[in-house]
């Protein structure tokens, strides 16, 4: 059993390496929305300022919108940021997320000619409830196994779409989510992602802002410096799978009453995901 576990891990790493080696270098890019800000206006403004991003990671829209983007940006690398593909949930392959959602994602990947499909390791909906923000997975061994199985299913669907159309398949990437309201489970976050990557040949996205939320909201800031926390976390995280690093996207949240929400006068600010913030 132990030998089988390590053989599986080595096989997944080998498959990932083969897929990753087929990706073109993308350089430094932006994660963008088609509509807000207007994507073509943004690109024009950047070019006027003498800035040329290596790529634009486009958030889910409609397939026709993605086709429009590709027509207007024929030479730009356009990887895809999916939404609504709740791979952390046990019913993913059978529910609308894994059927209609995956079909839409595959069509949009095809329209953009994306090198990868990035998705948060999180969900916003459960048994009919919508939370309006990302909730992290259960950080347990069972949850890691189920997430890996769902990622393998998703990659199979992406591969099948590529075969039908004679294109290169996009690589599925799993993004480390923010710590929002709470986190549950017995596994440390790096150990969870290690358990996932031992079982599936996916890539990872490391979001530095999301890493900061873990430091802030687990209370690690009370025990460690940020530098010590980050070094320990990244040493355990499967960095060999990281394809993309996100380095922006947080804004300080100011609650009414201010100091009453702080643990003490030295508490760090409340930072949250702020995808609507202006690009500066």
PLM region spans:
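N-terminal pre-domain/capping segments
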Residues: 2-107
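Active-site acidic/histidine proton-transfer and metal-coordination neighborhood
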Residues: 4-7, 15-16, 97-204, 213
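Short acidic, gly/pro-rich beta-turn/loop elements at beta-sheet edges
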Residues: 40, 90, 127-129, 184, ...
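Hydrophobic faces of well-ordered beta-strands that scaffold small-molecule active sites
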Residues: 26-32, 54-58, 76-82, 115-119, ...
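Distinct, well-ordered alpha-helical segments
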Residues: 42-45, 70, 182-199, 215-227
